[in-house]
Every structure is written in structure tokens, then in C-alpha cells.
Amino acid sequence: MRVVFMGTPDIAATCLRQILNAGMDVVGVYTQPDRPKNRGMKLAFSPVKEVALAHNLPVYQPENFREEETVQQLRALQPDVVAVVAYGRILPQKVLDIPQKGCINIHASLLPKYRGSAPYQWAVLSGEKETGVTAMYLCREMDAGDMIDTSTTPIGENETAGELLDRLAVIGAELLEKTLSRMEKGEVERTPQDSSMATYAPMLDKSMCPIDWTKTAQQVHDQVRGLHPWPVATTHIQGTFFKIHATVIVPGKEGAQPGTILGLTKTGLQIACGEGAVEIRSLQAEGGKRMAAPDYFRGHPLEA
């Protein structure tokens, strides 16, 4: 079965590596054009391109599929299936119609929940106890195609979105291999999504970063976890701006006003929330490095 793979970031590279190691016939790889990276602004290859070149696979990097020449280039590869993982482009119908067995996608949520570009982050932000990945067919509507299979995993109580993504990449890669194997054997069934149950996971932005201490400790903790490693929750402590990298939930103090410092322990700085409290374990002052909270405040003592 001839497979064309489309993807860009690390999660996609993990999936591509998995199906190549399984001996699948990948006849072409599509990824985003090379982009300037870091201060040097040198063009950098995507993680998927790195894997493809290491396996001597042809790489295609169109800006879009508006040009007929670009569509014909894909058609010439004669794919039986197109497998898409975090490609970063919406495929037009004329592309979806090319592969005989269809275009499939690995989406990092349990659809129909969290359709959109930041599914695993929103699962953490929303305080979900479990999430997973869905193998699905692509259609014109975003993340609304028929489902093929899912794989579920619990979310750790202190797990960040970044840590969760690392695990979902492995789970998604295994699900992609399983799905392609089943497609080759003609064993795939389609299950329509219940759109009435759909929720959406829009892109994150920095307006979401400031912590509102009137929220519950659980909500603050979920915000810190869900916005890590980007864009990272923020707050001011005694006039200094901080990025907050890690928290845990701790018992509150009755009558304490939200945002009040309850104390500095051996493990972190405890702050009252609207309900309960959190202990900041790791933070980063503006212009500084990430540090354990006790280490920072040892060098920058709190005001009485």
C-alpha cells in the first residue's frame, strides 16, 4: 500500500519514524516549508523533513495546494492513502479525493471533544482526567470526519501539556501503524462523530497567561499545566513579573484573600486561591532563568 505522509512537528516525526520502522511503503513526505529559527534566522528543517531525509525519501514543501501543478505532483505519487499528522495545512477537496483509500489523520484528542489546533492543551486546561488520540478520515470540515479508532490515556494530576504531548506522540504513532495495517487488509470501519457532543480547542495565545487568583486552586493549577511549555502562565509577586512553570495543589488557609502569600516552604511558595491554595515549585523572573522557587527567594527575600 502506497502511503504519502504529511506532517511537520515532533509528534509527526515520531509517527513517520514508527511507520517506516514497521516497513510501510512511504512514497513521499509533505511538510511545511523551511522556516527561519532562533536569532541567527537560519532556515531550519522541520522534524519530519529530518526523518524523511535520513530515510532518503522524497520531500515536498508547497506553501499550499492552490496550484494545479502542486496537486498533480501529489497525484503522480499514486498514493493509496494519505496519512496526516499535525501538517499545519487544511487540505482542499481536490487533494482529499486523490488517494483511493482516503486521507486519514491522527488527532490528539478523543473526538468529537477538542476539535481544533490545541486539543491536548485544552484537555489539560479543562481539568480532564483522561484524553487520547483518534484516527479519523479527513473531510472538508475541520476534525469532523468519520472516526476509525481511538486510544485512551489518563492525564497525570501534575502532568503538563508538553509532557502529555510526548506520550501522545508515542500513542499516536502506534495507532497510526495499527490503522494503516488495518486499511491495507480492508478491515477498517467508519464511525460518524456525534457533532452535538463536539467541543473546540482554539490556538493558545498570551492573553491566557495571567493567573486570576480568585479562581480555585484546581483551575490555577490546570492553567499552569495547560499553558506549559507555551505560552506559560504568569503573575506578579510583590511587584516582580514571573512566568510560572510548575505548581502543586496544597491546603488553603481559612479567610486568606486570593493572591495572598501564605508562606515559603522547603519545596515552594504557597499562594491562596479563591478556594484552596497552590504551591509554586518552579518560576522564572523576567529576564532570568527558570529556578526552583525556594532557590529564587533565598536570593531575593520576600518582604515581610
Language model regions located:
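N-terminal glycine-/serine-/threonine-rich beta1-alpha1-beta2 phosphate-ribose binding loop
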Residues: P36-Q78
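Donor/substrate-binding cores of folate-linked one-carbon enzymes
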Residues: N21-A22, Q32, V81, V85-Y200, ...
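An anion-binding loop in the catalytic cleft
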Residues: T214-A304
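N-terminal Rossmann-like dinucleotide-binding module
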Residues: M1-K42
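Conserved beta-strand segments of alpha/beta enzyme cores
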Residues: D25, N56-P58, G102
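Short beta->alpha connector loops
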Residues: T8-I11, E63-R66, Y87-I90
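A residue-level signal for conserved active-site and pocket-lining positions in enzyme catalytic cores
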Residues: G7, V29, A52, V82, ...
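Acyl-group handling in specialized metabolite and lipid biosynthesis
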Residues: P202-K215
